[in-house]
Design a protein with these regions (language model features):
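Conserved beta-strand position immediately N-terminal to the Walker
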Residues: 44, 108, 146
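Walker A/P-loop
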Residues: 35-75
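Conserved alpha-helical scaffold flanking the Walker A/P-loop in AAA+ ATPase domains
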Residues: 33-36, 89-109, 138
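C-terminal engagement/docking regions of AAA+ P-loop ATPases
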Residues: 1-3, 7, 239-319
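P-loop (Walker A) phosphate-binding loop of NTP-binding proteins
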Residues: 49, 83, 151
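Pre-Walker A (pre-P-loop) alpha-helix and adjacent loop at the N terminus of AAA/AAA+ ATPase modules
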Residues: 6-52
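Walker B catalytic acidic pair
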Residues: 48, 111-112, 123
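Canonical AAA+ ATPase core
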Residues: 90-95, 116-120, 128-220, 260-262
Length: 319
């Protein structure tokens, strides 16, 4: 992809980012990472307390790219069929008909995904990894683009089922969506909690535009020195005395794709170290497990962030 083409295509993405920032106040970093996820063909896990705008983010993104949106509130009594769909017998036609579930959408908000059982959680694995679901030995393609934005509350642990490592590894990245600062919250109150802005949000792109951009991201050049840089960070997570579980090959692929998407959003057709460094924590933190050798006063959920930051600081940046 030529520099001119990269700039022309990424200009549309910049317009999309500006539109989302007008709705999601004070969370520019979360908006950027959500766009990195969709352009890198990945999925996003958001940790945050209720009421900070997670649902609004999903709705705004779907509306801005003129795509369908579904929200599923996960509970402990849900079944996989509540998400995927179910085959129902039709007496008139004397055959089973498949009734599609909410997963058949472009943007799926899986709200409080750790409130449901591992069986229901795992029903999303095939959808997230392969873009299809299998019910009663029949496979059904999901609409494209397909993005899962899952949320979980880091504070309320009662009655939750922590996501297993295999499920966490399917998410391109995990971000924390905390409280807005005072100025952003003032703007939210002035705009009636953002509802007016969401209602006035018009499509900036189409689903076809997003698919085109996903292909453009694949063509972003990554120098071999940057590949070595990323692999060195990955290697150190596997050898760290403070981590009982390092980053998997799927994780290293995720960082590579995310860095390409970051460069794309910056209007470049090539990656730099600055595309990789800020993504290490959001892409890797949920994939590693900190052991008891790491002495820290930080919360358990924040210790992985700190270990990764220390690893990045000690890896030489290519010039």
């Amino acid at each position: 992809m030529s520099p001119e083409t990269a700039i022309a295509v990424s200009t549309k993405a910049v317009e999309l980012e500006k539109a989302l920032r007008r709705v999601i106040r004070g969370k520019d970093d979360v908006v950027r990472l959500a766009l990195v996820s969709i352009f890198a063909r990945g999925h996003l896990l958001i940790e945050g307390v209720p009421g900070v705008g997670k649902t609004t983010l999903g709705q705004a993104l779907a509306r801005a790219i003129d795509c369908t949106f579904q929200r599923v509130q996960f509970t402990s009594d849900m079944l996989p069929s509540d998400v995927l769909g179910i085959s129902v017998y039709s007496a008139a036609d004397q055959k089973f008909e498949f009734k599609r579930g909410p997963v058949f959408t472009n943007v799926l908000l899986a709200d409080e995904i750790n409130r449901t059982t591992p069986k229901t959680q795992s029903s999303l694995l095939e959808a997230m990894n392969e873009g299809q679901v299998t019910v009663d030995a029949h496979s059904y393609e999901l609409p494209q683009p397909f993005l899962v934005i899952a949320t979980q509350n880091p504070v309320e642990h009662h009655g939750t089922y922590p996501l297993p490592e295999s499920q966490l590894d399917r998410f391109l990245m995990r971000v924390r969506m905390g409280y807005p600062d005072a100025q952003a919250e003032r703007q939210i109150l002035r705009s009636e909690a953002g509802v007016a802005h969401l209602d006035s949000l018009h499509p900036v792109l189409t689903g076809a535009d997003v698919l085109e951009m996903q292909q453009a991201v694949k063509n972003i050049r990554v120098d071999d020195s940057l590949v070595s840089y990323a692999l060195e960070i990955v290697r150190r997570t596997r050898e760290s005395e403070f981590l009982s579980l390092g980053v998997s090959p799927r994780g290293s692929q995720a960082l590579y794709r995310a860095a390409q998407a970051m460069a794309f959003l910056e209007g470049r057709n090539f990656c730099t170290p600055e595309d990789f460094k800020p993504l290490v924590v959001p892409v890797f933190a949920h994939r590693v497990v900190v052991n008891n050798l790491y002495a820290s006063t930080l919360k358990k959920s924040e210790q992985s962030d700190q270990v990764l930051k220390e690893i990045v600081e000690n890896v030489a940046v290519p010039v």
